[in-house]
A protein has these predicted regions:
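A structural boundary/capping signal
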Residues: 1-185
Length: 185
């Protein structure tokens, strides 16, 4: 499965099961205000693949820092599973924001979300769990999404359940033991 296929499948799971993802803040209104949770979960899914990818979670802020948005850069390409949330408010000023973004070279809102902060997928997961959500609930949501992805097309999913669960548990254990340093933002 390619990263683009995984992104599209993950978005489908989010659309179909957003009401079940209560461990992710704001997911009952998906895609509105769900960018951080969606980016963190998708970033961890990519990190759990058997192939190696450079995954960066990007937080962009407006110039006045009143609005922010999260997306991913994976191997130099942009993935934004919640970009379409801006169609109603920014669609008259920016093109290409009516659907999610899968593997673009540039983010269409790069000039709107001007100031950018970048973190690895694992650090972004740690920050999200420590500052915005409950670690166990986020892990449960991640495992739920993984199980739904496996049910979509089992032959294409490259997420070995035992190995991926072990890696996720190790990250959660590091968070609990305080070994996952979260910088002050």
């Amino acid at each position: 499965m390619t990263i683009e296929q995984l992104a599209r499948s993950t978005r489908s799971v989010f659309e179909l099961h957003y009401e079940s993802l209560t461990g992710l803040p704001f997911f009952t209104s998906f895609p509105l205000n769900c960018c951080q949770g969606a980016s963190v979960v998708f970033g961890m899914l990519v990190k759990l693949l058997s192939t190696q990818h450079t995954v960066t979670v990007v937080k962009g802020d407006t110039r006045d820092r009143r609005e922010s948005h999260y997306w991913l850069e994976i191997d130099g390409l942009v993935y934004d599973l919640t970009l379409d949330q801006f169609q109603e408010t920014l669609g008259n000023r920016f093109d290409g924001i009516d659907t999610p973004l899968y593997g673009a070279t540039k983010h269409p809102l790069r000039m709107h979300f001007f100031y950018k902060e970048r973190h690895s997928a694992v650090l972004a997961f740690c920050i999200f769990c420590q500052k915005h959500a409950n670690t166990e609930e986020v892990d449960a949501a991640l495992q739920f999404v993984r199980s739904k992805l496996a049910n979509l097309k089992p032959s294409e999913i490259e997420l070995p359940m035992a190995t991926a669960k072990l890696r996720t548990k190790r990250t959660i254990t590091e968070i609990r033991r305080g070994k996952c340093h979260v910088p002050e933002l």
